[in-house]
């Protein structure tokens, strides 16, 4: 018989650096999940992407077991990384804090394609370009 799903918990964690401290502890501890087991499995699965912020979807079952799916990094994280910035603009419509090339935009769209609601690469590029604009980052040709 299949396990009964208790809850799906969504977190954003730095790859290879999950610890039982917040945010992992409070989010999973209330469902009785073995925190060290989750941290070891997550860190092992994401060790090759160290330093990257990754969304993770953790399915917790009634018997306190779990499975998790690691998604691609958020578009805003990838855009900031491509532009070499720590954060976006305070007033995006008024100030430009950085620029990225169309080639970088295409690479980000290819990376995010599986998680985006887009049928083709051009649509994905438009979504990522909108994210960049909302952060005060211009797209160069």
Swiss-Prot record:
SUPFAM superfamilies: Ribosomal L11/L12e N-terminal domain, Ribosomal protein L11, C-terminal domain
Record PTM text: One or more lysine residues are methylated.
Any GO molecular function: structural constituent of ribosome
Keywords from the UniProt entry: Methylation, Ribonucleoprotein, Ribosomal protein, RNA-binding, rRNA-binding
Listed GO biological process terms: translation
GO CC, any one term: cytosolic large ribosomal subunit
UniProt keyword rRNA-binding, yes or no: yes
Protein role: Forms part of the ribosomal stalk which helps the ribosome interact with GTP-bound translation factors.
Family of the protein in this entry: Belongs to the universal ribosomal protein uL11 family.
HAMAP family assigned: Ribosomal_uL11
Assembly notes: Part of the ribosomal stalk of the 50S ribosomal subunit. Interacts with L10 and the large rRNA to form the base of the stalk. L10 forms an elongated spine to which L12 dimers bind in a sequential fashion forming a multimeric L10(L12)X complex.
Protein name (database record): Large ribosomal subunit protein uL11
Species assigned in the record: Petrotoga mobilis (strain DSM 10674 / SJ95)
Gene name of this polypeptide: rplK
């Amino acid at each position: 018989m299949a396990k009964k799903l208790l809850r799906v918990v969504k977190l954003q964690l730095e790859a290879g650096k999950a610890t039982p401290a917040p945010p992992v502890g409070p989010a999973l501890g209330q469902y009785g999940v073995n925190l060290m087991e989750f941290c070891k499995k997550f860190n092992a699965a994401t060790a090759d992407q160290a330093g990257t912020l990754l969304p993770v979807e953790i399915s917790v079952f009634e018997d306190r077991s779990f499975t998790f799916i690691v998604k691609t990094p958020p578009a805003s994280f990838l855009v900031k990384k491509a532009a070499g910035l720590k954060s976006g603009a305070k007033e995006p419509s008024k100030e430009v804090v950085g620029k990225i090339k169309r080639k970088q935009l295409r690479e980000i769209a290819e990376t995010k394609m599986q998680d985006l609601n887009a049928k083709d690469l051009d649509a994905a590029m438009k979504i990522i370009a909108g994210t960049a604009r909302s952060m005060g980052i211009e797209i160069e040709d």
